């Protein structure tokens, strides 16, 4: 979807790495693997028609005529300290070579899926932990939800009876899927795969690029437009997508044999929407996706309430919106003083705005992190259930006191409902480049 990914593997010494699967993320570009600081935050200078741009995503792929990578010390001598870690020179198309107007279009529709699914251990994972517990001379393991040898045996029985038969919308039933011991500790014997709850099997994307170029006498022009629409893999988010609009115009005319004038403009808008739950439970939901073992419940309790989990928080989270706008104008001229001596002057104005809206969220869920509560009937009497979760009388064989999860509202760091945050960053730059070239050949 962008030039950076297209550069992968094309040039020796050029490393282009996609840092994450996050939609809309910029590729990390390194020339000869150079690192300029402890955190490795050094990147080459990116120039579009000799105009610095902050991101390679701002360039419409169909507008590119050529790309040159400067890797040696010569790049710094020409472009200064900013080019200490190399230069990526992008030259755009200038216009048609013949007296006509040319229109080109390219587009594609594609589907993305996760590159590798991390398989969660089920009952065998519980067995592994119990074996480790025995070697450590322990008898109980867990936090919020526990496992011991008794729960392991019950989990094995659950897997024989219910394994592969319950879906993501089937409730978490007391007696069948979990129980409470005499010390008021919760034990889950049902196993969950968080992948099924949080990640889409596939996500669509589309790109469209159109280019218009032409020539009239000694004047050439090129107009390019591009659009990218990419959906993320987060299943439960209200919005998880990235959109990019690019536009450019180039105009050049030869006034006489000594002077050539040029002008151009670039526009880029990038918009990313995502569930504002990045720090909703002291860490990223993607960490909690695999932090807990497979016995930690996800989905709904038997009252139809969402249970507290990274999936529930992503589902309920308000949508954050991150927007980047970039606009530049440039004018310039080339003076051909003699056949071997030319003089270039270019002026560029560039402005970039970043607007980041983050609306806090108040979460409501059955709390899987706190102590269970007794289930009582309308008269305040204890309810009893069997190992299928069915309500039975207290004297029935196998009857056990029924428990449930408390239903409450809560907030956490990073998604607090008491704020509606709007961050605006503006960067304006005026650049004047004056260069001269003289070719002198000695025989």
Language model region names:
Residues 1-247, 260-262:
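Short, small/polar-rich motifs associated with maturation and membrane association
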Residues 3, 326-328:
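Short, solvent-exposed loop/turn segments enriched in Ser/Thr/Gly
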Residues 105, 223, 331, 434-436:
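Residue-level preference for non-acidic, small/hydrophobic
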Residues 106-110, 226-228, 266-268, 330, ...:
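Outer-membrane beta-barrel pore domains and translocons
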Residues 107, 129, 206-208, 341, ...:
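Polar/charged side chains located within well-ordered beta-strands of beta-rich proteins
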Residues 114-116, 186-226, 230-233, 244-324, ...:
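Flexible loop and strand-edge segments within Gram-negative outer membrane beta-barrel domains
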Residues 121, 130-194, 290-313, 372-425:
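Flexible glycine-rich, low-complexity coil/linker segments exposed to the extracellular/periplasmic environment
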Residues 251-255, 324, 334-349:
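A conserved hydrophobic secondary-structure block that centers on an alpha-helix together
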């Amino acid at each position: 979807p962008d030039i950076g990914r297209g550069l992968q593997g094309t040039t020796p010494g050029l490393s282009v790495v996609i840092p994450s699967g996050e939609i809309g993320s910029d590729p990390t570009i390194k020339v000869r693997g150079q690192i300029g600081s402890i955190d490795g935050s050094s990147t080459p200078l990116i120039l579009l028609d000799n105009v610095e741009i902050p991101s390679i995503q701002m360039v419409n792929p169909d507008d590119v005529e050529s790309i040159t990578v400067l890797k040696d010390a010569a790049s710094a001598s020409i472009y200064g300290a900013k080019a200490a870690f190399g230069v990526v020179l992008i030259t755009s198309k200038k216009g048609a070579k013949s007296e006509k107007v040319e229109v080109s279009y390219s587009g594609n529709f594609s589907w993305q899926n996760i590159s590798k699914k991390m398989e969660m251990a089920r009952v065998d994972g519980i067995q592994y932990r119990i074996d480790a517990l025995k070697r450590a001379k322990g008898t109980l393991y867990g936090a919020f939800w526990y496992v011991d040898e008794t729960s392991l045996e019950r989990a094995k029985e659950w897997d024989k009876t219910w394994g592969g038969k319950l879906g993501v919308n089937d409730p978490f039933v007391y007696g069948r899927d979990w129980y409470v011991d005499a010390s008021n500790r919760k034990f889950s014997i049902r196993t969950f795969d968080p992948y099924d709850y949080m990640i889409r099997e596939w996500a669509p994307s589309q790109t469209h690029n159109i280019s218009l170029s032409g020539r009239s006498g000694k004047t050439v022009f090129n107009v390019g437009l591009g659009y990218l629409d990419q959906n993320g893999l987060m299943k439960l988010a209200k919005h998880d997508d990235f959109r990019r609009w690019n536009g450019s115009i180039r105009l050049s005319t030869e006034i006489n044999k000594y002077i050539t004038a040029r002008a151009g403009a670039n526009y880029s808008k990038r918009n990313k929407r995502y569930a504002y739950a990045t720090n909703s439970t002291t860490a990223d939901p993607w960490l909690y996706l695999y932090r807990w073992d497979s016995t930690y419940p996800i989905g709904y309790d038997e009252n139809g309430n969402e249970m507290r989990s990274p999936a529930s928080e992503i589902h309920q989270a308000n949508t954050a919106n991150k927007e980047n706008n970039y606009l530049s104008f440039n004018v310039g001229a080339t003076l051909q003083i003699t056949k071997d001596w030319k003089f270039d002057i270019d002026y560029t104005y560039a402005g970039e705005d970043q607007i980041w809206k983050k609306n806090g969220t108040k979460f409501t869920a059955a709390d899987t992190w706190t102590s269970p509560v007794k289930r009582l009937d309308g008269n305040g009497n204890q309810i009893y259930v069997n190992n299928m979760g069915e309500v039975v009388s207290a004297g029935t064989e196998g009857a056990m006191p029924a428990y449930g999860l408390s239903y409450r509202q809560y907030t956490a760091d990073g998604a607090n409902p008491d704020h509606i945050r709007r961050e605006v960053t503006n960067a304006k730059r005026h650049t004047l480049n004056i260069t001269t070239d003289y070719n002198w050949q000695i025989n």
